[in-house]
């Protein structure tokens, strides 16, 4: 794994965090407790800060970077090969595999960005919705079952990461 400073700013890593051997965490990155950073993920805080809340998972091949601060809430799942670039992702949200969330976009809490979707720069979406498409649009409101699924995904990754320690 690569954990290194950028211009004298070091990453801050919370308690009980799993970081895979092939992940890269650089510069102004703050990771909350019980998080997991999976294989080939790149968290590059050499532009603006990256802040990740508690119990969140950054899956294989994800890139977090940006010209604006990147904020990932608590209990968030960022799926394989997704890109979050200078955006805000609310608590209990799932970013699907291969999704792209661009600069200054805001995803409300308790939401899902469907796999392969593109959230364009500057878009703000309310909480509790399913976003889908290129460009991403609200398809429907989430059910309580959907929201519980998001929370279960985050919990599963906390539990799974503990098996790697």
Language-model features: where?
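Structural signal for interior beta-strand "rungs" in well-ordered beta-sheet cores
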Residues: 6-8, 12-126, 130-131, 136-138
